[in-house]
Curated annotation (Swiss-Prot):
HAMAP family: Ribosomal_bS20. PANTHER family: 30S RIBOSOMAL PROTEIN S20 (PTHR33398), SMALL RIBOSOMAL SUBUNIT PROTEIN BS20C (PTHR33398:SF1). InterPro entries: Ribosomal_bS20 (IPR002583), Ribosomal_bS20_sf (IPR036510). GO terms for cellular component: cytosol; small ribosomal subunit. Keywords: Ribonucleoprotein, Ribosomal protein, RNA-binding, rRNA-binding. One of its GO terms (biological process) is translation. It comes from the Bacteria. Belongs to the bacterial ribosomal protein bS20 family. Transmembrane segments: none annotated. SUPFAM superfamilies: Ribosomal protein S20 (SSF46992). This is Small ribosomal subunit protein bS20. The lineage of its organism: Bacteria, Bacillati, Bacillota, Bacilli, Lactobacillales. Binds directly to 16S ribosomal RNA. Disulfide bonds: none annotated.
Length: 82
């Protein structure tokens, strides 16, 4: 993998490559979370609520979102469920 970086030291180049990979994984996980939330909001159902809640929990456990944001998001979704 070729990463555009100013780093000259081998370990710094490797860290830059790993940072790009981590950013792609994290972005994909957050995007999946947002997609699950939007799917639930478009058609509130118990099944979609569980999927959205699960994706929020996964993002929280990976450190992508703060635990308070996860709780707030799940509470708002639960309120929409009724």
């Amino acid at each position: 993998m070729e990463v555009k970086t100013l780093a000259n030291i081998k370990s710094a180049i490797k860290r830059a490559e790993l940072n790009v990979k981590a950013n792609e994984k994290n972005s994909a996980q957050k995007s999946a979370m947002r997609t699950a939330i939007k799917a639930f909001e478009a058609n509130p159902s118990e099944e979609l609520f569980r999927a959205a809640s699960s994706s929020i929990d996964k993002a929280e456990s990976k450190g992508l979102i703060h635990k308070n944001k996860a709780s707030r998001d799940k509470a708002r979704l639960a309120a929409k469920l009724g």
